[in-house]
Amino acid sequence: MDSQYFLAFSLSLLLIFSQISSFSFSVDPTRITQLSWTPRAFLYKGFLSDEECDHLIKLAKGKLEKSMVVADVDSGESEDSEVRTSSGMFLTKRQDDIVANVEAKLAAWTFLPEENGEALQILHYENGQKYDPHFDYFYDKKALELGGHRIATVLMYLSNVTKGGETVFPNWKGKTPQLKDDSWSKCAKQGYAVKPRKGDALLFFNLHLNGTTDPNSLHGSCPVIEGEKWSATRWIHVRSFGKKKLVCVDDHESCQEWADAGECEKNPMYMVGSETSLGFCRKSCKAC
């Protein structure tokens, strides 16, 4: 590995470990499968218990509204669209003990701080409902100010689906084709796909390791053919979500030391950032 990329990765880990929740959760590596490198995707079988799944669904019932999509990249305003036909709602962060534990488990598994995550979104798909392929990263200025790009997405399946409802990655690139029998929907055969199974969680990254957006992360929710689908989504940003970065600050106590060592020039993506994603040491690098 090139030394500058190794150092950037090490700096990232330092930042992450300094912010992760103290909640104790043992990640079971025997339940985790790496599905793909393009995009980087992982499946954690049995991440949520049946009780956790049922509780999240119960919190959402009676509060669901038609799902929306972003319509204006400048304002971030949303609109109704046939691209996305599910219904959903957002919980509040740490709404109760179970929600707080789920959020802490997500931080422990992903090694990404709790504060970087949006509130959990609960989604319900009935017969024929779907979400066409889309990206979870974005370029609207309002969203970027609230935490930068969504570095990762975690989809947690809260119910089993008789048929359909798979998560599909149309731009997936792999050496070995994924074999699919008649139990898979036609939509799922358009790329690499994951069947929704109650309790399982799918983690995939929307950005490359160097911080640039990954077009291979294009994904969609296939139409439900039989049954219904419940899921919970956790979008995780590159920095604390909801705090506008309008002041010139460093996001790590070692920024000045790294800047003095020349890291502003050696690792500009991490230290300074780009037009669409702010770096972590802009003040020390005199970028603002």
Swiss-Prot record:
Species assigned in the record: Arabidopsis thaliana
Gene: P4H6
One Pfam family hit: 2OG-FeII_Oxy_3
Enzyme class (EC, first level): oxidoreductase
UniProt cofactor(s): Fe(2+); L-ascorbate
Superkingdom classification of source: Eukaryota
Record-given protein name: Probable prolyl 4-hydroxylase 6
Function: Catalyzes the post-translational formation of 4-hydroxyproline in -Xaa-Pro-Gly- sequences in proline-rich peptide sequences of plant glycoproteins and other proteins. Hydroxyprolines are important constituent of many plant cell wall glycoproteins such as extensins, hydroxyproline-rich glycoproteins, lectins and arabinogalactan proteins.
Swiss-Prot/TrEMBL catalytic activity: L-prolyl-[collagen] + 2-oxoglutarate + O2 = trans-4-hydroxy-L-prolyl-[collagen] + succinate + CO2
UniProt GO MF annotations: iron ion binding; L-ascorbic acid binding; procollagen-proline 4-dioxygenase activity
